[in-house]
A protein has these predicted regions:
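Short stretches within intrinsically disordered, low-complexity N-terminal or propeptide regions
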Residues: 17-21, 137
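Intrinsically disordered, low-complexity serine/threonine-rich segments
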Residues: 8-10, 26, 227
């Protein structure tokens, strides 16, 4: 399935190159937007089996830059109102033109909360592309919102940190919690960052001229007390030092716990007790 998606995007890339040559670079952004929409047709089938995807413009909002300052660190924030979020069981983030289009597949748990829902992270972008958020509700329906973002080169951009320095801090976590009360309901936000190079396999070592092997965080589970807030499966499209900020439920006295694994099989864990908030 992934091979099928890659071949479709390769064909689209050749068409884009030809069009830019004939029509001029001034038309490239508009053509890129059209091309990425065409790529989505194949991804839609590969990822969701061609199931109907409904317009979520009144139920999901996405905050992302029109033009990113750094294609290796593109901030995106997804928000859903409580009335809709209560029925959402999963969220999939997709960048059409990335070598690995599925950025993250997120499953919500019992501690996801009953209020407005928010998830913020940072992603890599290889080319100008639509960025999509697709929510699945408990009745199996899919709802999508998308935004076209101008950014390129993020998947092959050199790491921000020296490899030896990154190795020393590999897996270390920083976790923060933000709590506020609204009436009788507790609304909370938390944030964590995992020190990890999240290499893509497309980055060249400037000294050796060789490509750095891919190594990335591919599994994350976040809990409030004994209950899961969300679990995630990810890939190379998540930025270096994966960073997530999110809303959640649970009790103010709960410990926030984060467990993660990477593609080399290494495991990492961290937690934040209420006294540390």
């Amino acid at each position: 399935m992934l091979k099928l998606s890659m071949s479709r995007r390769a064909a689209t890339g050749l068409a884009m190159t030809a069009a830019m040559t004939l029509s001029g670079a001034a038309f490239a952004p508009a053509f890129a937007e059209t091309a990425t929409s065409a790529v989505w047709q194949g991804l839609h089938k590969d990822i969701f089996g061609g199931r109907e995807v409904l317009d979520a413009k009144d139920m999901i909002s996405m905050d992302a830059p029109i033009r990113a300052e750094d294609a290796a660190v593109v901030p995106i924030t997804i928000k859903m109102p409580a009335s809709f979020a209560a029925n959402v069981k999963s969220l999939t983030l997709v960048v059409d033109q990335n070598p690995s289009p599925v950025v993250a597949a997120i499953k919500y748990g019992a501690a996801a909360g009953t209020g407005d829902r928010m998830l913020s992270t940072r992603i890599r972008m290889d080319q100008y592309s639509d960025v999509r958020a697709i929510a699945e509700t408990n009745d199996g329906k899919l709802y999508m919102i998308s935004k076209f973002v101008k950014a390129s080169g993020g998947c092959s951009a050199p790491a921000a940190k020296d490899a030896e320095e990154a190795a020393k801090s590999l897996g270390k976590m920083q976790i923060k919690k933000f709590v506020s009360k609204e009436g009788d309901a507790l609304t909370a936000e938390a944030q964590f960052m995992i020190k990890h190079p999240n290499t893509t396999g497309m980055q060249m070592d400037q000294v050796t001229g060789l490509y750095t092997p891919a190594r990335y965080v591919n599994k994350i589970e976040v809990k409030s007390g004994a209950d899961v807030i969300f679990s995630m499966e990810g890939g190379i499209s998540i930025s270096e030092d994966p960073n997530f900020r999110f809303t959640h439920g649970g009790k103010a006295s709960d410990v926030i716990e984060v467990k993660a694994e990477d593609s080399d099989g290494a495991s990492f864990a961290g937690q934040l007790a209420p006294s540390q908030s």
